[in-house]
Structures are given as structure tokens and as C-alpha cells.
Design a protein with these regions (language model features):
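Basic, amphipathic alpha-helical bundle interface domains used for macromolecular binding and assembly
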Residues: 24, 160, 180, 187-296
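Conserved ASCE/P-loop NTPase catalytic core
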Residues: 4-221, 260
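Trafficking entry modules
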Residues: 299-300
């Protein structure tokens, strides 16, 4: 399905009965999951920010945490089955992911092969070489030794991970996740809705998937502008930060602010707009603030 930006925007606006379709569209993403629209929006933000820029990282790392059987793996499976993500289990081998310089062919180098792609990693707390993820999550590249020489490989992956026990995940890795979502056991009402879904299934699943894929593909190709046109524009975009810092009576690191800006850029793409405004920055701060409550470590 090939659709123009205007066609996609028109259809989505009709679906949402207004311009604010970003609050409605997540319901159609990963329909196998009942509820969790906040998680769906976060994963969609991850999908639309494919590449970093000369200014730094644009890719958004997502962590899904909670006890087994709460729905985390459904997102992982959806990304693998519908979005072509590289699926990794907790026991993935470093030699397969980054390569093996001792081999003449350098090994598999899955991270390099999935440069620009999606990686869905289940049970990351069981990954023995988890610290090797740090440079990839932050910089989108890594260095490996080949024949006694060091070579740099591009690995700008969109990373979505799931963990049952984050106490086993090193803090430097946890601090690289832009958005963290906790999954509780379903409530009585949620369990009833899940039972309804499992019995009735999803209507028009193939058409819905095609529509969402066309939407995400269109959003990915938008390059939103963050820099303001004048001093008034600068003040307007800084105001959400100033209001937030004053409300909590503390400042935040540059890394935290950069995370807000890349989330805001993703939200702008999902709105099919070409300029980040104070509205998207404020929404990104709300998403990030809720996420920060899931981890007791600073994003710095």
C-alpha cells in the first residue's frame, strides 16, 4: 500500500474525528494487546525515529518490565512478526551480535546487519554480555578487533527490550532507556477484555496492519525542525522545560533534556507535522516523567 502524506493524514483524521489522532491511533497498533495505549505510543515513537542526526542520537530505546505473563512478550513478538525485528532471547551470544574478530569472516555481526532496523530483545537480564549494549544504545556504533586492528561498525538499531527482573540489569544500561513501562498482572476488567479478544479475535486485522504500516512509514520520512525561527520561538520551546524544573524544584542533565527532544520529535512525526512545538515538548516531558518513576536511577 503506497499512500501520500495527505492521504494518510486524511484517513487518520477521519478515524479520530479530529486532528488529535495521535491519541486514537495507538489503539490500532499491536491489536493483540488489550489496553496499554501508553506503551503502544512509546513503541511507535521508537519506530518512527530510525536514524541519528549530526546533532546526536535520535533513536529511542524502550524497556518493558514486569513479571512473566503480563503482556510484555506480546509486544516483542509483534515487532518480530509484523515489523521484521531481529528477535533476541536472553541467552544471545555476543559473538553473534557484534561479531568474532578471531574468525576470517568476522562472524555474524547481527547488530551491524540490522543497522537501521529493529531489535526486540526478550529477557535481557539473562544476557551475560549485556554491558556490550551500552555503546550501541547510546552511539549506534561499536568497535571490534579484526586481525589485530580495530574497526568501527554502524549499528543504529531501534531497541525494544523486555525484562522480568531489572535488578539484574546494570545501571549504565538502564539509564540508556528513554522510556520504561511497567506491566502489572491484569485486573478483573482487563482479564475479561482479554478473554473477549481471545475468543472473538481482531476484526480486519490485515487491513489494520496495512494502515498502521503505511502511517508509520509516512511518519518516518518526515524530518521535523526543532530549532526556532526567532527568539520568541525559542522562549516558547524552552518554557515547558522551565515550568517542569520549577515545579519539581530541581534541574535535569543534558542527557535527560536530549531524551525529551527526541521523544518530542517522534511525537511530531506521529502527528505528521514538520515542526516540533512546545506542545510536543510538554507531552514528551509527561511521558518521560511517568517513565522515570519506573526506575530509581538518574537518566544521566
Amino acid at each position: 500500500m503506497t499512500m501520500s502524506l495527505d492521504e494518510v493524514r486524511e484517513i487518520l483524521t477521519e478515524m479520530a474525528e479530529g486532528d488529535d489522532f495521535i491519541q486514537v491511533v495507538p489503539e490500532f497498533f499491536c491489536p493483540e494487546v488489550v489496553g496499554h495505549n501508553d506503551v503502544k505510543l512509546g513503541v511507535m515513537c521508537c519506530l518512527v525515529n530510525q536514524w541519528d542526526t549530526p546533532d546526536g542520537r535520535d533513536r529511542i530505546n524502550i524497556l518493558l518490565k514486569g513479571q512473566p505473563g503480563c503482556g510484555k512478550t506480546i509486544f516483542i513478538d509483534h515487532l518480530r512478526d509484523r515489523w521484521g525485528a531481529l528477535y533476541l532471547s536472553g541467552d544471545a551470544k555476543k559473538s553473534s551480535l557484534k561479531g568474532d574478530g578471531r574468525r576470517s569472516d568476522g562472524g555474524i555481526r547481527l547488530f551491524a546487519k540490522y543497522n537501521g532496523g529493529i531489535v526486540a530483545h526478550d529477557e535481557i537480564e539473562e544476557f551475560s554480555d549485556i554491558n556490550t549494549l551500552r555503546d550501541i544504545m547510546e552511539n549506534g556504533r561499536y568497535v571490534d578487533a579484526i586481525g589485530g586492528k580495530y574497526e568501527e561498525f554502524e549499528a543504529q538499531i531501534r531497541y525494544v527490550a523486555a525484562a522480568n527482573d531489572i535488578s539484574k540489569v546494570p545501571k549504565p544500561i538502564l539509564s540508556r532507556f528513554d522510556l520504561v513501562y511497567h506491566f502489572d498482572m491484569p485486573s478483573v476488567e482487563d482479564s475479561i477484555r482479554i478473554a473477549q479478544y481471545l475468543i472473538a479475535g481482531v476484526k480486519n486485522l490485515e487491513t489494520t496492519d496495512e494502515m498502521i504500516y503505511a502511517y508509520i512509514s509516512t511518519a518516518m520520512n518526515i524530518d521535523p525542525v526543532i530549532r526556532p525561527r526567532d527568539i520568541d520561538g525559542l522562549d516558547a520551546k524552552v518554557k515547558p522545560f522551565a515550568d517542569h524544573f520549577e515545579s519539581i524544584n530541581e534541574g535535569k542533565s543534558g542527557r535527560w533534556i536530549k531524551s525529551i527532544l527526541r521523544i518530542a520529535k517522534a511525537l511530531t512525526r506521529l502527528k505528521l507535522k514538520d515542526e516540533v512545538t512546545a506542545v510536543e515538548i510538554e507531552e514528551a516531558i509527561e511521558m518521560k516523567t511517568a517513565s522515570d518513576k519506573q526506575l530509581e536511577i538518574p537518566f544521566d
